[in-house]
Amino acid sequence: MYEYFEGTITVVNPAYVVIEVAGIGYRILTPTPYAYKDGDKARIYVEQVVRENGMTLYGFKSQQDKVLFNKLNEVSGIGPKSALAIMAAEDNGALASAIESGEVSYLTRFPGIGKKTASQIVLDLRGKMGNYVAENLFTEDEPVKSVFPALEDALLALGALGYSQKEVDRIKPKLKKLPEMSADEYIKQGLGFLLKK
């Protein structure tokens, strides 16, 4: 079982990054791929999920994010991909607060989360998020420098998170009107537009 990988980022993709450690490249699915830059030295905390069709590595900027991922993944009706999509769509401190306060309607705004699953999240995790909320363990990632194809990368990432092409196309004009920003910031803005509906 792996705890974390420390090495050089060699690929940044809308859904994953590749980190090279001792000459081996590990593909890691992460909720915030654009928080990393090609060539950066990084430490990624990982969770290894083994299924019949193979092994997948999920990676996070902090140990606390990894713990939250595992808690979400343990909820009935939530798999690792759904847990990752939820974490990509929201600041983790705000997510923990929503779970603690039982905001079911808030949780149903995430892709693939209906009322039943949102209620299950609250039922299973309420009372277990207090430390995250009280101690404010979750911190904002450092801003990423803007790159030319940032908007297109962000739109691809939104598609990878489960949003349809129609939904992505609907918010594209709104994102184009915004000042130029990093792909990660475009993703956050885009998710804000998508969740408002």
Curated annotation (Swiss-Prot):
Role: The RuvA-RuvB-RuvC complex processes Holliday junction (HJ) DNA during genetic recombination and DNA repair, while the RuvA-RuvB complex plays an important role in the rescue of blocked DNA replication forks via replication fork reversal (RFR). RuvA specifically binds to HJ cruciform DNA, conferring on it an open structure. The RuvB hexamer acts as an ATP-dependent pump, pulling dsDNA into and through the RuvAB complex. HJ branch migration allows RuvC to scan DNA until it finds its consensus sequence, where it cleaves and resolves the cruciform DNA.
GO molecular function, one term: ATP binding
Known partners and oligomeric status: Homotetramer. Forms an RuvA(8)-RuvB(12)-Holliday junction (HJ) complex. HJ DNA is sandwiched between 2 RuvA tetramers; dsDNA enters through RuvA and exits via RuvB. An RuvB hexamer assembles on each DNA strand where it exits the tetramer. Each RuvB hexamer is contacted by two RuvA subunits (via domain III) on 2 adjacent RuvB subunits; this complex drives branch migration. In the full resolvosome a probable DNA-RuvA(4)-RuvB(12)-RuvC(2) complex forms which resolves the HJ.
Ubl conjugation recorded as keyword: no
Example of a GO cellular component annotation carried by this entry: Holliday junction helicase complex
CDD domains in alphabetical order: UBA_RuvA_C (cd14332)
Biological process, per Gene Ontology: DNA recombination; DNA repair
Annotated source species: Lactobacillus delbrueckii subsp. bulgaricus (strain ATCC 11842 / DSM 20081 / BCRC 10696 / JCM 1002 / NBRC 13953 / NCIMB 11778 / NCTC 12712 / WDCM 00102 / Lb 14)
Localization terms from the record: Cytoplasm
Domains as described in the record: Has three domains with a flexible linker between the domains II and III and assumes an 'L' shape. Domain III is highly mobile and contacts RuvB.
Matching Gene3D superfamilies: 5' to 3' exonuclease, C-terminal subdomain, DNA helicase RuvA subunit, C-terminal domain, Nucleic acid-binding proteins
Residue ranges of the region described as Domain I: 1-61
SMART domains given in the database record: HhH1 (SM00278)
Family matches, as NCBIfam families: ruvA
InterPro entries membership: DNA_helicase_Holl-junc_RuvA_I, Hlx-hairpin-Hlx_DNA-bd_motif, NA-bd_OB-fold, RuvA, RuvA_2-like, RuvA_C, RuvA_C_sf
One protein family per Pfam: HHH_5
Spans annotated as Flexible linker: 141-150
Protein name per the record: Holliday junction branch migration complex subunit RuvA
